[in-house]
């Protein structure tokens, strides 16, 4: 939604990422697929959107939107797929288009944190395949490539992904995506949520995000983006002090977008 991305840049967000793009149009999962819930006493959102997208061909004309590029801030394109070949095909289509544009601050985010392969597994379950895919991306593009992983990944899985990325130039890791929970555990039923479970976002994810940032920073010199559960200046400051290069927000933009200028003000006065 260009209008929302524009408004968030107006209030001071430092960069944006388009939602995940697939090769072909997809409606995603059946509705109802997003609900406000309480988790551990905190406000949260549970979604089972299922990566709705208009497909890469319909997305390409929208990338270079002057309302967004005029801020001259980084713009990310999140890429998904139902197979490795689809990931690469989408990447190649977008890279060919970006090469003819005059805006230079595009980057890629590779969404490996959903079950996006033919056998129903996450791409992160096959690390050799992941490594091969990112190396293929690097052969045709010099842009920054960020790999977005799930907070449900084990510490060992996260560190193995970091090992791969640490040997490929201009890469970073994004911790992370939403956390899978069953719908009935947060008071939902099949009448108000179409799937058995979904991805939880909100402040209750923060402590695990902080823990994983510290884990990565103590083992690898790799750029880290921390996005799970960030909801205040104190969160941002603690993550940056713990080794994150950047922080990202999603649910906060829904619940209290005016935290953005407050966070920026506090950071500028540190």
What do the PLM-derived regions correspond to, one by one?
Residues 25-42, 182-198, 240, 246, ...:
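C-terminal helical cap(s) of enzyme catalytic domains, especially alpha/beta-barrels
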Residues 91-141, 146-151, 164:
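Metal-dependent enolase-superfamily TIM-barrel catalytic cores that perform enediolate-based chemistry
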Residues 44, 53-72, 125-147, 193-224, ...:
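Alpha-helix-loop-beta-strand connector modules within alpha/beta enzyme cores
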Residues 1-75, 263:
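N-terminal capping/small domains of soluble enzymes
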Residues 15-17, 72-80, 105-109, 144-148, ...:
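Structural preference for beta-strand elements that scaffold enzyme active sites
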Residues 112-125, 158-218, 222, 258-265:
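Glycine/Thr-rich beta-alpha phosphate-binding loop at enzyme active sites
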Residues 15-23, 107, 112-114, 172-179, ...:
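Glycine-rich phosphate-binding active-site loops on the catalytic face of alpha/beta enzymes
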Residues 1-10, 89-94, 153-167, 217-220, ...:
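Catalytic cores of alpha/beta
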């Amino acid at each position: 939604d260009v209008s929302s991305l524009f408004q968030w840049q107006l209030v001071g967000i430092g960069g944006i990422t388009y939602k995940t793009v697939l090769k072909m149009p997809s409606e995603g999962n059946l509705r109802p697929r997003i609900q406000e819930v309480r988790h551990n006493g905190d406000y949260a959102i549970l979604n089972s959107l299922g990566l709705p997208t208009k497909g890469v061909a319909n997305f390409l004309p929208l990338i270079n939107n002057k309302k967004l590029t005029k801020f001259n801030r980084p713009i990310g394109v999140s890429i998904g797929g139902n197979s490795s070949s689809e990931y690469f095909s989408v990447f190649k289509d977008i890279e060919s288009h970006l090469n003819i544009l005059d805006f230079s601050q595009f980057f890629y985010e590779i969404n490996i944190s959903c079950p996006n392969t033919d056998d129903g597994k996450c791409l992160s379950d096959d690390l050799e395949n992941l490594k091969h895919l990112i190396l293929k991306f690097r052969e045709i593009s010099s842009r920054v490539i960020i790999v977005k992983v799930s907070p449900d990944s084990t510490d060992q899985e996260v560190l193995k992904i970091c090992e791969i990325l640490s040997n490929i130039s201009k890469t970073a890791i994004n911790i992370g995506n939403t956390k899978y929970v069953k719908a009935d555990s947060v008071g939902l039923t099949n009448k108000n949520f179409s799937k058995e479970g979904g991805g939880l976002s909100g402040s209750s994810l923060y402590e695990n995000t902080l823990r994983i940032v510290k884990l990565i920073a103590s083992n690898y010199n790799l750029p880290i983006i921390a996005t799970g559960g960030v909801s205040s200046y104190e969160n941002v400051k603690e993550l940056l002090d713990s080794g994150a290069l950047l922080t990202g927000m999603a649910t906060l933009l829904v619940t209290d977008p005016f935290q953005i200028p407050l966070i920026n003000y506090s950071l500028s006065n540190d």
